[in-house]
């Protein structure tokens, strides 16, 4: 830190007429925050703490400064510097940080709980909360922990490794989750381990969180964990559509987290992630409707060639506005196995909504069945819903002809999914099992017994 600060003093104190102007403080803070995020993702907590603290010091007084200092405290704690973490955390709350529940339940700060200053820090954050302009996003309650995909790691093992307790508040920590994933991969010979957390913003599950540890045993990699090669190019953004979609999604997410997005807000196409009913969002959809049909090829190029996964995901969402449903499907189908989770999620979301709205099959059953075996819960839940809609649209004789092969290929996976606690993973699996079996069972034990009675080979 001293070395960096000294360089800054020299540069500013030279007084030369040709010296560069000091960087804009807001831009400098943003750059430092981006560097801190990179360090955080790399589990480089020393650099993460230093960069977030520098971002806070570069920023003006206000919530962004307090948030940067709060993040610096988490990284310092993870780096093993408890005293330094306390010092910077005090500065965060003195600067107005007010998300007291997040602070209290943040696992990155667990090492500070036994220190004398902890209770005072929490109390000051709660005092700040009383003066906050609006309440923070509430900390959810953990409702379930699932383990999926490994023959060697069960639900209780995952719960113990993660140190989670159902019924307690949970704060997401990407760094701690990655550490636990690495531990499981090394200890149980997994080629893939990914922890995901699903939050519910509405319905009877509002305020609930579910954690899923998705895994692939090393011997299953060829079937379940192969993807397209990562793109390396930089495709043109046609008429700024990618940027506009990202602007829409950013604002829509803000409104959703603030509880300001109407649940019945709709779209004029099959796929809809938040609608356009709010005044802040109303201008976006007419633009997408007018421009996307002219740029289907260019958006498909982004999806195929651009190295930026965020741009590829946006292109997938925009292709829902292609002139016909079949064009949407044909553009997206080749990218079901994109190497990035978020892109696959976007592709499968649009395919699922498009098939749901259709009256005839738009994809081959084998393509969708392969997608059900993908490694993450985001992959599987959408692929399995997609399969339910596809089977609904198959003629009865076609469904009957494929029944045995589908049971052979997917039966075990679907039965395992029927035992999960996360409803959006369990429910579509039960739906497909009912379609394939003609039975109306509900529990995983009933489906296990049913599967045991089926022939062991197709045909």
Show where each model-derived region lies:
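Start-of-helix register in tetratricopeptide repeats
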Residues: 30, 64-67
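TPR/TPR-like alpha-solenoid helical repeat scaffolds
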Residues: 66-71, 99-125, 429-434
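Extended repeat-based scaffolds of very large eukaryotic assembly and lipid-transport proteins
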Residues: 126, 216-326, 337, 341-345, ...
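Periplasmic polypeptide-binding modules associated with outer-membrane biogenesis and secretion
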Residues: 126-151, 160, 164-230
């Amino acid at each position: 830190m001293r070395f960096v600060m000294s360089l800054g003093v020299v540069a500013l104190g030279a007084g030369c007429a040709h010296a560069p102007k000091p960087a804009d403080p807001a831009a400098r803070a943003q750059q430092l925050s981006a560097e801190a995020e990179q360090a955080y993702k790399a589990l480089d907590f020393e650099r993460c703490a230093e960069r977030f603290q520098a971002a806070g010091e570069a920023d003006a007084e206000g919530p962004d400064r307090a948030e940067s200092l709060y993040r610096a405290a988490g990284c310092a704690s993870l780096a093993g510097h408890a005293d330094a973490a306390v010092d910077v955390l005090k500065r965060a709350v003195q600067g107005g940080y007010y998300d007291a529940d997040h602070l209290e339940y943040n696992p990155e700060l667990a090492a500070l709980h036994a220190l004398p200053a902890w209770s005072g820090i929490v109390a000051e954050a709660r005092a700040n909360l009383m003066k906050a302009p609006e309440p923070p996003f509430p900390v959810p309650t953990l409702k379930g922990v699932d383990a999926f995909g490994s023959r060697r790691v069960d639900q209780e093992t995952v719960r113990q490794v993660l140190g989670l307790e159902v019924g307690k508040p949970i704060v997401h920590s990407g760094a701690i989750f990655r550490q636990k994933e690495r531990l499981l991969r090394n200890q149980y010979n997994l080629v893939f381990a990914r922890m995901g957390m699903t939050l519910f913003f509405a319905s009877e599950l509002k305020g609930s969180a579910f954690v899923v540890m998705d895994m692939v045993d090393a011997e299953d990699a060829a079937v379940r964990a192969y993807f397209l090669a990562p793109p390396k190019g930089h495709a043109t953004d046609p008429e700024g559509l990618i940027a506009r979609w990202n602007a829409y999604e950013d604002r829509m997410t803000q409104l959703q987290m603030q509880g300001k997005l109407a649940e019945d807000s709709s779209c004029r196409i099959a796929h809809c992630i938040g609608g356009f009913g709010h005044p802040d969002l109303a201008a976006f959809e007419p633009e997408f409707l007018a421009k996307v049909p002219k740029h289907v090829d260019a958006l498909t190029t982004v999806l195929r060639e651009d190295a930026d996964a965020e741009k590829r995901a946006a292109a997938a969402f925009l292709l829902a506005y292609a002139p016909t449903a079949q064009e949407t499907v044909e553009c997206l189908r080749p990218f079901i196995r994109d190497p990035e989770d978020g892109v696959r999620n976007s592709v499968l979301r649009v395919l699922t909504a498009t098939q749901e709205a259709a009256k005839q099959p738009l994809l081959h059953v084998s393509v969708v069945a392969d997608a059900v075996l993908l490694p993450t819960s985001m992959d599987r839940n959408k692929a399995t819903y997609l399969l339910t809609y596809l089977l609904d649209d198959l003629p009865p004789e076609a469904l009957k002809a494929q029944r045995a092969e589908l049971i052979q290929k997917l039966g075990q996976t679907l039965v395992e999914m029927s035992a999960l606690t996360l409803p959006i993973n369990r429910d579509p699996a039960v739906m497909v099992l009912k379609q394939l079996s003609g039975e109306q069972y509900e529990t995983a034990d009933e489906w296990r017994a049913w599967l045991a009675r089926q022939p062991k080979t197709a045909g």
